[in-house]
Amino acid sequence: MNTAVNVNVVHESEAQRQHARVRIPAKLRFLDAQRQVHEVKVEDLSAGGLSFHTKQPQSVGDVLRGRLQFVVDNLGLSIDIEFQVRSYNPDNGRIGAQFQNLEPRDIATLRHIITSHLSGELISIGDVLSTLQRDNFTKARKQKDGGSGLSAFGRFKAVTVTLGVFVVGVAAFGFVAKSLYGMYFVSHAEAGVVAVPTTNVTMPRDGTVSSLVESGGQIAKGAPLASFTTSMLDMLKGNLEDAQLEPAKIEELFGKQLSGTLTSPCDCVVARQLVDDGQYAAKGQPIFQLIPRTTTPMVEARFSYRQFDEVKPGTRVNFQVAGEDEVRTGQIVSSASLNSEDLSSDIRVQIKPDTGLPAELAGRPASVNSDRGPSLNWLIDKAVARGL
Protein backbone atom coordinates (compact mmCIF):
# COMPACT_ATOMS: atom_id res chain seq x y z
CA MET A 1 0.00 0.00 0.00
CA ASN A 2 1.39 3.37 -1.00
CA THR A 3 1.04 5.84 1.87
CA ALA A 4 3.08 8.62 0.25
CA VAL A 5 1.51 12.04 0.44
CA ASN A 6 0.46 13.44 -2.88
CA VAL A 7 1.45 17.10 -2.81
CA ASN A 8 -0.88 17.84 -5.70
CA VAL A 9 -3.97 17.09 -3.60
CA VAL A 10 -5.51 20.24 -2.18
CA HIS A 11 -8.62 21.00 -0.18
CA GLU A 12 -11.75 20.76 -2.29
CA SER A 13 -14.47 23.27 -1.56
CA GLU A 14 -18.14 22.48 -1.84
CA ALA A 15 -18.40 24.51 -5.03
CA GLN A 16 -15.75 22.29 -6.66
CA ARG A 17 -17.08 18.95 -5.40
CA GLN A 18 -18.73 16.47 -7.81
CA HIS A 19 -22.38 16.29 -6.84
CA ALA A 20 -24.24 13.01 -6.55
CA ARG A 21 -27.51 13.02 -8.43
CA VAL A 22 -30.73 12.15 -6.64
CA ARG A 23 -34.23 11.38 -7.82
CA ILE A 24 -36.52 14.26 -6.89
CA PRO A 25 -40.04 14.82 -8.23
CA ALA A 26 -39.64 17.75 -10.61
CA LYS A 27 -40.54 18.84 -14.12
CA LEU A 28 -38.54 20.69 -16.76
CA ARG A 29 -39.94 22.97 -19.45
CA PHE A 30 -37.36 24.02 -22.04
CA LEU A 31 -36.94 25.39 -25.54
CA ASP A 32 -34.92 23.35 -27.99
CA ALA A 33 -32.74 24.71 -30.77
CA GLN A 34 -35.82 25.02 -33.02
CA ARG A 35 -37.62 27.11 -30.36
CA GLN A 36 -40.10 24.32 -29.64
CA VAL A 37 -41.42 23.92 -26.09
CA HIS A 38 -40.94 20.57 -24.37
CA GLU A 39 -42.13 19.49 -20.95
CA VAL A 40 -40.41 16.44 -19.47
CA LYS A 41 -40.02 14.72 -16.14
CA VAL A 42 -36.66 15.09 -14.42
CA GLU A 43 -35.02 11.71 -13.88
CA ASP A 44 -32.29 12.81 -11.47
CA LEU A 45 -31.00 16.13 -10.24
CA SER A 46 -27.94 17.60 -8.57
CA ALA A 47 -26.55 21.05 -7.88
CA GLY A 48 -24.39 20.65 -10.99
CA GLY A 49 -26.83 19.29 -13.53
CA LEU A 50 -29.75 17.00 -14.34
CA SER A 51 -30.93 14.24 -16.69
CA PHE A 52 -34.24 13.57 -18.42
CA HIS A 53 -35.78 11.58 -21.29
CA THR A 54 -37.14 13.15 -24.43
CA LYS A 55 -38.39 11.84 -27.75
CA GLN A 56 -36.81 14.67 -29.69
CA PRO A 57 -33.06 14.19 -30.24
CA GLN A 58 -30.77 16.98 -29.07
CA SER A 59 -27.27 17.79 -30.18
CA VAL A 60 -24.43 17.46 -27.69
CA GLY A 61 -23.03 20.89 -26.85
CA ASP A 62 -26.25 22.83 -27.38
CA VAL A 63 -27.01 25.39 -24.69
CA LEU A 64 -30.73 25.47 -23.92
CA ARG A 65 -32.92 27.51 -21.63
CA GLY A 66 -35.68 26.18 -19.44
CA ARG A 67 -37.49 26.24 -16.14
CA LEU A 68 -37.32 23.73 -13.28
CA GLN A 69 -40.62 23.29 -11.48
CA PHE A 70 -41.08 21.91 -7.95
CA VAL A 71 -44.11 21.54 -5.71
CA VAL A 72 -43.46 22.76 -2.14
CA ASP A 73 -46.33 22.96 0.38
CA ASN A 74 -48.82 22.76 -2.52
CA LEU A 75 -47.14 25.81 -4.03
CA GLY A 76 -45.21 25.90 -7.27
CA LEU A 77 -41.52 26.78 -7.10
CA SER A 78 -39.84 27.58 -10.41
CA ILE A 79 -36.17 28.18 -11.16
CA ASP A 80 -35.08 29.59 -14.51
CA ILE A 81 -32.01 27.70 -15.71
CA GLU A 82 -29.59 27.50 -18.60
CA PHE A 83 -28.01 24.12 -19.32
CA GLN A 84 -25.69 22.49 -21.82
CA VAL A 85 -26.32 19.07 -23.33
CA ARG A 86 -23.32 16.92 -22.40
CA SER A 87 -24.59 13.47 -23.45
CA TYR A 88 -27.42 11.93 -25.48
CA ASN A 89 -28.41 8.26 -25.68
CA PRO A 90 -30.46 7.68 -28.86
CA ASP A 91 -31.57 4.21 -27.67
CA ASN A 92 -33.68 5.49 -24.77
CA GLY A 93 -33.59 9.25 -25.39
CA ARG A 94 -31.75 10.04 -22.15
CA ILE A 95 -30.06 13.44 -22.03
CA GLY A 96 -27.44 14.42 -19.47
CA ALA A 97 -27.06 18.18 -18.99
CA GLN A 98 -24.86 20.53 -16.99
CA PHE A 99 -26.12 23.79 -15.51
CA GLN A 100 -24.63 27.00 -16.90
CA ASN A 101 -24.48 30.46 -15.30
CA LEU A 102 -26.64 29.64 -12.29
CA GLU A 103 -27.25 32.51 -9.89
CA PRO A 104 -26.02 32.04 -6.29
CA ARG A 105 -29.63 32.12 -5.05
CA ASP A 106 -30.60 29.33 -7.46
CA ILE A 107 -27.61 27.22 -6.39
CA ALA A 108 -28.51 27.71 -2.71
CA THR A 109 -32.13 26.71 -3.38
CA LEU A 110 -31.10 23.54 -5.25
CA ARG A 111 -28.69 22.56 -2.48
CA HIS A 112 -31.37 23.05 0.16
CA ILE A 113 -33.90 20.96 -1.75
CA ILE A 114 -31.38 18.16 -2.39
CA THR A 115 -30.05 18.16 1.20
CA SER A 116 -33.55 18.07 2.69
CA HIS A 117 -34.56 15.25 0.36
CA LEU A 118 -31.48 13.17 1.25
CA SER A 119 -32.03 13.65 4.99
CA GLY A 120 -35.69 12.72 4.74
CA GLU A 121 -36.99 16.10 5.88
CA LEU A 122 -40.11 17.72 4.55
CA ILE A 123 -39.39 20.79 2.44
CA SER A 124 -41.36 23.85 3.53
CA ILE A 125 -41.71 27.16 1.78
CA GLY A 126 -40.48 28.92 4.93
CA ASP A 127 -37.17 27.05 4.80
CA VAL A 128 -36.78 27.96 1.14
CA LEU A 129 -37.43 31.65 1.83
CA SER A 130 -34.97 31.58 4.74
CA THR A 131 -32.34 30.08 2.46
CA LEU A 132 -32.92 32.80 -0.12
CA GLN A 133 -32.59 35.57 2.47
CA ARG A 134 -29.16 34.65 3.81
CA ASP A 135 -25.80 34.88 2.08
CA ASN A 136 -24.63 31.32 1.45
CA PHE A 137 -21.41 32.19 -0.36
CA THR A 138 -18.23 33.63 1.06
CA LYS A 139 -16.55 36.57 -0.62
CA ALA A 140 -13.37 36.02 -2.58
CA ARG A 141 -10.21 36.69 -0.66
CA LYS A 142 -8.38 39.88 -1.51
CA GLN A 143 -4.97 39.31 -2.97
CA LYS A 144 -2.19 41.27 -1.31
CA ASP A 145 -0.58 43.53 -3.82
CA GLY A 146 2.50 44.24 -1.69
CA GLY A 147 2.78 47.72 -3.20
CA SER A 148 3.95 46.36 -6.55
CA GLY A 149 1.08 48.12 -8.30
CA LEU A 150 2.01 51.58 -7.01
CA SER A 151 4.10 53.96 -9.03
CA ALA A 152 7.15 55.70 -7.60
CA PHE A 153 5.10 58.84 -6.95
CA GLY A 154 2.34 56.76 -5.33
CA ARG A 155 4.82 55.10 -2.99
CA PHE A 156 6.40 58.45 -2.13
CA LYS A 157 2.98 59.92 -1.42
CA ALA A 158 1.99 56.96 0.78
CA VAL A 159 5.25 57.17 2.74
CA THR A 160 4.89 60.95 3.12
CA VAL A 161 1.32 60.72 4.39
CA THR A 162 2.24 57.94 6.81
CA LEU A 163 5.24 59.89 8.08
CA GLY A 164 3.15 63.05 8.44
CA VAL A 165 0.47 61.25 10.45
CA PHE A 166 3.18 59.68 12.63
CA VAL A 167 4.85 63.06 13.28
CA VAL A 168 1.52 64.70 14.13
CA GLY A 169 0.67 61.83 16.48
CA VAL A 170 4.05 62.06 18.24
CA ALA A 171 3.71 65.85 18.55
CA ALA A 172 0.20 65.55 19.99
CA PHE A 173 1.33 62.87 22.44
CA GLY A 174 4.31 65.02 23.50
CA PHE A 175 2.10 68.07 24.01
CA VAL A 176 -0.39 66.16 26.14
CA ALA A 177 2.40 64.50 28.14
CA LYS A 178 4.11 67.84 28.75
CA SER A 179 0.83 69.47 29.81
CA LEU A 180 0.05 66.66 32.25
CA TYR A 181 3.61 66.75 33.61
CA GLY A 182 3.41 70.51 34.14
CA MET A 183 0.03 70.16 35.84
CA TYR A 184 0.99 67.47 38.36
CA PHE A 185 4.76 67.81 38.86
CA VAL A 186 5.63 71.52 38.40
CA SER A 187 4.76 74.37 40.79
CA HIS A 188 4.75 77.80 39.13
CA ALA A 189 5.29 81.05 41.01
CA GLU A 190 2.65 83.73 40.59
CA ALA A 191 5.35 86.45 40.42
CA GLY A 192 9.12 86.78 40.74
CA VAL A 193 11.77 89.51 40.74
CA VAL A 194 15.55 89.84 41.06
CA ALA A 195 16.07 91.60 44.40
CA VAL A 196 19.21 93.08 45.99
CA PRO A 197 19.70 95.27 49.08
CA THR A 198 19.94 98.90 47.96
CA THR A 199 21.32 102.10 49.47
CA ASN A 200 19.57 105.44 48.96
CA VAL A 201 21.46 108.74 48.64
CA THR A 202 19.26 111.60 49.85
CA MET A 203 19.30 115.37 49.24
CA PRO A 204 21.06 117.24 52.09
CA ARG A 205 19.39 120.62 51.31
CA ASP A 206 16.51 121.94 49.31
CA GLY A 207 17.77 122.67 45.80
CA THR A 208 18.35 121.43 42.29
CA VAL A 209 20.36 118.36 41.29
CA SER A 210 22.73 117.66 38.38
CA SER A 211 23.96 114.07 38.00
CA LEU A 212 27.61 113.27 37.30
CA VAL A 213 27.13 109.53 36.53
CA GLU A 214 24.73 107.54 34.38
CA SER A 215 22.32 104.85 35.54
CA GLY A 216 24.02 101.45 35.50
CA GLY A 217 27.46 102.95 35.91
CA GLN A 218 29.91 101.78 38.57
CA ILE A 219 31.23 104.21 41.15
CA ALA A 220 33.84 103.92 43.90
CA LYS A 221 33.32 104.82 47.52
CA GLY A 222 33.66 108.59 48.08
CA ALA A 223 33.44 109.42 44.36
CA PRO A 224 31.07 112.28 43.42
CA LEU A 225 27.63 111.21 42.31
CA ALA A 226 26.01 114.58 41.61
CA SER A 227 26.26 118.26 42.29
CA PHE A 228 23.51 120.35 43.79
CA THR A 229 22.86 124.08 44.26
CA THR A 230 20.93 125.71 47.07
CA SER A 231 20.29 129.32 48.12
CA MET A 232 22.19 131.03 50.94
CA LEU A 233 18.88 131.83 52.57
CA ASP A 234 18.12 128.12 52.93
CA MET A 235 21.53 127.54 54.48
CA LEU A 236 21.05 130.29 57.09
CA LYS A 237 17.41 129.58 57.80
CA GLY A 238 16.84 129.57 61.54
CA ASN A 239 20.17 131.25 62.27
CA LEU A 240 19.34 134.84 61.22
CA GLU A 241 18.96 137.64 63.77
CA ASP A 242 16.15 140.17 63.65
CA ALA A 243 18.44 142.80 62.09
CA GLN A 244 19.15 140.43 59.19
CA LEU A 245 15.48 139.86 58.39
CA GLU A 246 15.07 143.12 56.57
CA PRO A 247 13.63 142.76 53.04
CA ALA A 248 16.75 144.01 51.33
CA LYS A 249 18.93 141.61 53.32
CA ILE A 250 16.64 138.66 52.59
CA GLU A 251 16.64 139.48 48.87
CA GLU A 252 20.43 139.61 48.92
CA LEU A 253 20.69 136.24 50.68
CA PHE A 254 18.13 134.65 48.33
CA GLY A 255 20.13 135.70 45.29
CA LYS A 256 23.30 134.03 46.50
CA GLN A 257 23.70 130.33 45.53
CA LEU A 258 25.85 127.67 47.17
CA SER A 259 27.04 124.49 45.43
CA GLY A 260 27.66 121.07 46.94
CA THR A 261 28.48 117.50 45.95
CA LEU A 262 26.78 114.16 46.68
CA THR A 263 29.30 111.35 47.17
CA SER A 264 28.94 107.57 47.03
CA PRO A 265 28.89 105.81 50.41
CA CYS A 266 30.17 102.50 48.93
CA ASP A 267 31.60 100.72 45.92
CA CYS A 268 28.30 100.54 44.13
CA VAL A 269 26.42 100.40 40.90
CA VAL A 270 23.92 103.17 40.18
CA ALA A 271 20.63 101.33 39.92
CA ARG A 272 18.27 104.28 39.44
CA GLN A 273 18.26 108.07 39.45
CA LEU A 274 15.08 109.08 41.20
CA VAL A 275 15.21 112.85 40.44
CA ASP A 276 15.98 114.14 36.94
CA ASP A 277 18.73 116.65 36.29
CA GLY A 278 17.74 120.26 36.95
CA GLN A 279 14.70 119.28 39.01
CA TYR A 280 14.05 120.67 42.48
CA ALA A 281 14.40 118.23 45.37
CA ALA A 282 13.43 118.72 48.99
CA LYS A 283 15.74 118.00 51.85
CA GLY A 284 15.86 114.25 52.67
CA GLN A 285 14.35 113.21 49.33
CA PRO A 286 16.09 110.12 47.77
CA ILE A 287 18.11 111.08 44.71
CA PHE A 288 19.96 107.86 43.80
CA GLN A 289 19.42 104.16 44.47
CA LEU A 290 22.74 102.31 44.72
CA ILE A 291 23.53 98.59 44.75
CA PRO A 292 26.74 97.47 46.52
CA ARG A 293 28.98 95.60 44.11
CA THR A 294 29.82 93.00 46.77
CA THR A 295 26.16 92.08 47.23
CA THR A 296 24.88 88.83 45.70
CA PRO A 297 21.49 89.36 44.01
CA MET A 298 18.71 87.08 45.18
CA VAL A 299 15.44 86.12 43.55
CA GLU A 300 12.19 86.67 45.40
CA ALA A 301 9.03 84.87 44.31
CA ARG A 302 5.42 84.59 45.43
CA PHE A 303 3.69 81.21 45.54
CA SER A 304 0.13 80.28 46.41
CA TYR A 305 -0.50 79.18 50.00
CA ARG A 306 -1.67 75.78 48.72
CA GLN A 307 1.88 75.14 47.49
CA PHE A 308 3.57 75.66 50.88
CA ASP A 309 4.68 72.02 51.08
CA GLU A 310 6.24 72.22 47.61
CA VAL A 311 8.44 75.31 48.19
CA LYS A 312 10.08 74.54 51.51
CA PRO A 313 13.62 75.80 52.28
CA GLY A 314 16.13 73.60 50.50
CA THR A 315 13.89 72.97 47.49
CA ARG A 316 15.58 73.22 44.11
CA VAL A 317 13.98 75.61 41.62
CA ASN A 318 14.49 76.83 38.06
CA PHE A 319 14.13 80.48 37.08
CA GLN A 320 14.58 82.66 34.03
CA VAL A 321 15.18 86.41 34.20
CA ALA A 322 13.39 88.65 31.71
CA GLY A 323 15.65 89.53 28.79
CA GLU A 324 17.76 86.38 29.10
CA ASP A 325 17.48 83.07 27.25
CA GLU A 326 19.37 81.09 29.89
CA VAL A 327 17.41 79.09 32.45
CA ARG A 328 19.20 79.27 35.81
CA THR A 329 18.92 77.09 38.89
CA GLY A 330 18.89 77.91 42.57
CA GLN A 331 17.77 76.85 46.02
CA ILE A 332 15.11 78.25 48.32
CA VAL A 333 16.74 79.64 51.49
CA SER A 334 13.71 81.10 53.25
CA SER A 335 9.93 80.93 53.10
CA ALA A 336 7.48 83.18 54.91
CA SER A 337 3.92 84.41 54.70
CA LEU A 338 3.38 87.81 53.14
CA ASN A 339 0.98 88.76 55.91
CA SER A 340 1.18 86.79 59.14
CA GLU A 341 -2.20 88.14 60.26
CA ASP A 342 -4.00 86.87 57.16
CA LEU A 343 -4.19 83.07 57.03
CA SER A 344 -5.06 83.10 53.33
CA SER A 345 -2.11 85.21 52.20
CA ASP A 346 0.49 83.97 49.72
CA ILE A 347 4.00 82.75 50.51
CA ARG A 348 7.13 84.78 49.80
CA VAL A 349 10.32 82.81 49.19
CA GLN A 350 13.94 83.86 48.74
CA ILE A 351 16.05 81.94 46.23
CA LYS A 352 19.83 81.82 46.19
CA PRO A 353 21.15 81.28 42.64
CA ASP A 354 23.75 78.57 42.06
CA THR A 355 25.77 81.08 40.00
CA GLY A 356 26.10 84.77 40.72
CA LEU A 357 23.75 87.21 39.02
CA PRO A 358 24.99 90.52 37.61
CA ALA A 359 23.89 93.50 39.68
CA GLU A 360 22.43 95.06 36.52
CA LEU A 361 19.60 92.49 36.64
CA ALA A 362 18.19 93.98 39.84
CA GLY A 363 14.51 94.75 39.58
CA ARG A 364 13.87 92.58 36.53
CA PRO A 365 10.91 90.17 36.64
CA ALA A 366 11.64 86.46 36.71
CA SER A 367 9.71 83.26 35.98
CA VAL A 368 10.18 80.70 38.77
CA ASN A 369 9.06 77.06 38.95
CA SER A 370 9.77 74.02 41.08
CA ASP A 371 10.03 70.64 39.33
CA ARG A 372 9.10 67.64 41.50
CA GLY A 373 8.99 65.05 38.71
CA PRO A 374 11.31 62.08 38.17
CA SER A 375 14.84 63.21 37.42
CA LEU A 376 17.60 61.59 35.35
CA ASN A 377 20.32 63.87 36.67
CA TRP A 378 21.98 60.95 38.48
CA LEU A 379 22.29 59.08 35.19
CA ILE A 380 23.69 62.16 33.44
CA ASP A 381 26.21 62.72 36.26
CA LYS A 382 27.43 59.12 35.97
CA ALA A 383 27.81 59.46 32.21
CA VAL A 384 29.77 62.70 32.60
CA ALA A 385 31.98 61.12 35.28
CA ARG A 386 32.87 58.29 32.90
CA GLY A 387 33.60 60.70 30.08
CA LEU A 388 30.71 59.61 27.87
Curated annotation (Swiss-Prot):
Keywords: Alginate biosynthesis, Periplasm. Transmembrane segments: none annotated. It holds the Pfam family PilZ. GO terms for cellular component: periplasmic space. It comes from Pseudomonas putida (strain ATCC 47054 / DSM 6125 / CFBP 8728 / NCIMB 11950 / KT2440). Belongs to the Alg44 family. This is Alginate biosynthesis protein Alg44. Pathway: Glycan biosynthesis; alginate biosynthesis. The gene is alg44. GO terms for biological process: alginic acid biosynthetic process. InterPro entries: MFP, PilZ_domain. One of its GO terms (molecular function) is cyclic-di-GMP binding.
